Amino acid sequence: MLDASVVQSAIRIPQSAIQWWHQAFLVRRPSVSLGLFRLAVAFTVGAHMIPSFFEMDENYLATAFTTQNPSFFPLWILRLVAGSPDWLIWSWTLVFLVSLATFAVGLFTQASCLVMTVASYYFYALNNYHIGTLSFDILLVTLILMCVTGFHGDFLSLDSLRRGDVRAHKRLRPFFVQRLLQQQLVWTFWYTALNKISAGGNWLIDNPYYYLIRYPPIGVVRDFPLRNWLGQHPTLCYQLGLTLLAFEFLLPLLWLIPRTRPVGIALGVAFQLMLWATLHVPTIFLFLFPPMMLLFIRPEAVVRWIEARQARQAARGRAVLLYDGQCGFCLESVKRLRVLDLFGWVDPLDFHAQPDLSALHPSLTPERCRSEMLLLEPNGRLSGGFYAFARLSLRLPLLLGCAPLVHLPGAAWIGTRVYRWVAAHRDLFHRNPTCATNQCAIRQAGNGAPLQGGAGGSSKAWS
């Protein structure tokens, strides 16, 4: 019979492995980093694909000279895509642009990612022309991991705004997507290094970097200032090649060790900039790899940084946004505003709860507070209506994308009129059936008395 201690030790090993697996991949952690990484992925895909659309007749339409990649796609897919009429190609172009935009802003994030991924590889199957296969292979793995879940839509997205999730940056999700993205980057670097010393690689016994330096100017190497000088020093080129090889092996280790991560991330970003400055490498390496390195930062550290910013803002003093707490539409708007106010710059205040409005600002009156939202900044500046929104767009990080639009010449003229129209027709935007005839009707209790906290008879338009 087996010794009981042997059996126990045999059981203990799988249990420890299960615990490690759970800690590494399944433990629930904030998904804030994935929301930020989504923006980098959207930018990378757009930068990779959109320039090719400027020459549709040369790249994709029936007039284009196309090449295909049978080592990447099955032949039946290549034949199917090759038969696409021009109208279908234009339709896929529109599908790609719409899905890219919705993915970037985080609207129906997972579905948008799926459609964007299919559209991207439709065009790659149509013509692979100058697009490097390696870059599309790397991008495919990243996009598939992003398609698996919608976790990247938890933060910095219209999806979180629709949910009214004030704690979106703290939302806990299984960590496996972020962990797999980390592993993708680690193994990409190690694969590149191993390829230099195996499977025909000769960086240890030969001097490939020296040969690259001496290629014609139109080759792989850019015409950077030290190129001609390096071409005259083959020994130095060999030493630089060995240094590069060692760097590609060691850099992922710096990311994996918590204490060395800051140094590893800084070196990794500098390395990508150096590659871009000296070699004609695919832009995906510069646009995607540095954000992937930032995924090694603990998401809890990102949350703590956000909370520290909120605490500093509270100590300096917040702006006050006056709204009508008896207006259902206003309450919903304030709920969305809290999602946009990541760093706690604004303190919403129901003007009904302020007995003396003039104590806040001499020009404040109940009538004005009912007619428009009012923003009172710590320096005493008071803005109302569209102008209050314009000021918010400069202060709230999640509204910064609107700032250039609302400050264009003529935007104030249009914006004030749109605001007034919304003020007059806000019942069209409210799902509550008690809102009718542009008034928030007072719901009556069984004895005929108005319910406290119900929708009041306010003409307040926008909060």
Question: Which residues are covered by each model-predicted region?
Answer:
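Thiol/selenol-based redox catalytic cores and closely related redox-interacting motifs
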Residues: 352-448, 462
